[in-house]
């Protein structure tokens, strides 16, 4: 049976393998194709596509866009939208996601200040040295940094005590509405998918409302299986 993975991250965001290494891993486990869907960036796609072509694997250009959803009973819920088969050279698309990254960078600067004030020395330079200059830094990177420095014992502890929603180091940042992310993906020729709904911890009725809302704006699919490694 030929298998495809439609939700994969590289070191361009919070993955552990470089784009080329992901291709090698995909070939090792027998994947026919995989989608590179890094957070708010397409920086790894060219490298992955080149390696995939040599390996005889289909590389699906993608992205995972972080959004913020509000409804009658839900306020500022972070929702992720995966885009598949996007034109990752589309200039308007690239301009939009660059703005999303700028908002994330502003959040990161505030987070670094909060950690230093709490007696956990950290700097942007140290983060870049550890994870790379071109990496989109996410809360997962801060969790790994905290583990490496001995501030916490695990990534889970970092989120449970400090980085998770409602915790001392959680900073709400500006994000687009999920419907805008769906539209943006479609404008770039892609297919929009609601990522990992099981992680949002909302009621079945609210999830149904979310899906109906996004479908009106062009949502094509819902992620039904998510594997973390």
Language-model-detected regions and their locations in the chain:
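Extended substrate/RNA-proximal surfaces in nucleic-acid metabolism proteins
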Residues: 53-208, 212
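Divalent metal-dependent hydrolysis catalytic cores, especially in the metallo-beta-lactamase
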Residues: 23-43, 58-64, 222
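N-terminal glycine-/serine-/threonine-rich phosphate-binding loop
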Residues: 1-3, 12, 16-29, 33
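Metal-dependent catalytic neighborhoods of phosphoester/phosphodiester hydrolases
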Residues: 43-52
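Structural recognition of alpha->loop->beta junctions
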Residues: 210-225
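Conserved small/polar residues in nucleotide/adenosyl-binding loops
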Residues: 228-229
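Histidine-centered catalytic micro-motifs
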Residues: 3-13, 194-198
């Amino acid at each position: 049976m030929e298998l495809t993975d439609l939700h994969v991250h590289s070191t361009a965001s919070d993955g552990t393998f470089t784009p080329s290494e992901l291709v090698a891993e995909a070939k090792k486990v027998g994947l026919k194709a995989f989608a590179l869907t890094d957070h708010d960036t397409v920086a790894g796609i060219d490298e992955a596509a080149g390696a995939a072509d040599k390996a005889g694997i289909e590389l699906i250009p993608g992205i995972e866009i972080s959004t913020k959803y509000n409804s009658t009973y839900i306020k500022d819920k972070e929702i992720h939208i995966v885009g598949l088969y996007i034109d990752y050279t589309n200039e308007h698309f690239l301009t939009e996601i660059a703005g999303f990254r700028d908002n994330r960078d502003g959040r990161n600067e505030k987070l670094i200040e909060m950690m230093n004030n709490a007696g956990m020395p950290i700097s942007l330079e140290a983060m870049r040295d550890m994870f790379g200059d071109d990496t989109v830094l996410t809360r997962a990177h801060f969790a790994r940094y905290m583990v490496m420095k001995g501030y916490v014992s695990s990534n889970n502890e970092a989120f449970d005590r400090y980085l998770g929603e409602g915790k001392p180091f959680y900073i709400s940042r500006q994000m687009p509405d999920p419907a805008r992310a769906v539209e943006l993906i479609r404008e770039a020729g892609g297919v929009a998918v609601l990522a990992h709904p099981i992680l949002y911890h909302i009621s079945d009725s609210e999830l149904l409302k979310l899906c109906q809302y996004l479908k009106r704006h062009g949502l094509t699919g819902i992620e039904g299986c998510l594997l973390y490694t």
